[in-house]
């Protein structure tokens, strides 16, 4: 699992996956979510996020080309593409030329049409109602 946005701290899915031991490798290479308040992101902050995403992209390409994996999860890569931290055409090219046996999962909101076009399966999850909207905090074992 290569995380493009998340920094690797405080995410419940990581705690669960750690229990699988060596069966799962997690590389958290992001600087955290950046656009909760887009107007307050400085140019310097944006450049740090872009540099981290570019480093994550280089690592991803190396791992894809290594042919060492059956599955690679590109966590929040759609967000990174949407925020223009990673070029969508580079991702499409990688998807078209990855080893045939390699399965990939791309997560995150705002998948570009170019990504959807090359995908075999696309699933969209939408919140209909969420406890957070009522002020109910995240629950251990549910959200983390």
Language-model segment annotations:
Residues 109-144:
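Phosphate-binding/switch region of NTP-binding enzymes
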Residues 19-21, 66, 99, 116-117:
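Short, well-ordered coil/turn elements that cap or connect secondary structure elements
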Residues 5-9, 32-34, 78-79, 110-113, ...:
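Conserved nucleotide-binding/hydrolysis micro-motifs of P-loop NTPases
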Residues 14-18, 41-42, 86-90, 118-122, ...:
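Short, glycine/charged-enriched secondary-structure capping and boundary segments
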Residues 38-100:
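Phosphate-binding/switch loop-helix module in NTP-utilizing enzymes
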Residues 1-63:
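Conserved P-loop
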Residues 26-28, 106, 124:
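Structural signal for conserved beta-strand scaffold positions within catalytic alpha/beta enzyme cores
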Residues 94-112:
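Sensor-1/coupling segment of RecA-like P-loop NTPase cores
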């Amino acid at each position: 699992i290569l995380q493009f946005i998340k920094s690797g701290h405080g995410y419940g899915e990581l705690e669960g996956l750690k229990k699988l031991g060596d069966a799962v490798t997690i590389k958290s290479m992001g600087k955290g979510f950046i656009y909760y308040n887009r107007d307050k992101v400085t140019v310097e902050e944006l450049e740090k996020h872009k540099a981290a995403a570019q480093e994550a992209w280089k690592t991803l390409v190396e791992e894809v080309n290594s042919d060492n994996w059956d599955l690679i999860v590109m966590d929040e890569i759609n967000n990174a593409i949407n925020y223009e931290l990673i070029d969508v055409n580079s991702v499409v090219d990688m998807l078209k030329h990855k080893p045939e046996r390699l399965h990939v999962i791309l997560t995150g909101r705002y998948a570009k049409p170019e990504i959807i076009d090359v995908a075999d399966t696309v699933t969209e999850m939408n919140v209909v109602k969420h406890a957070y909207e009522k002020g109910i905090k995240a629950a251990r074992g549910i959200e983390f």
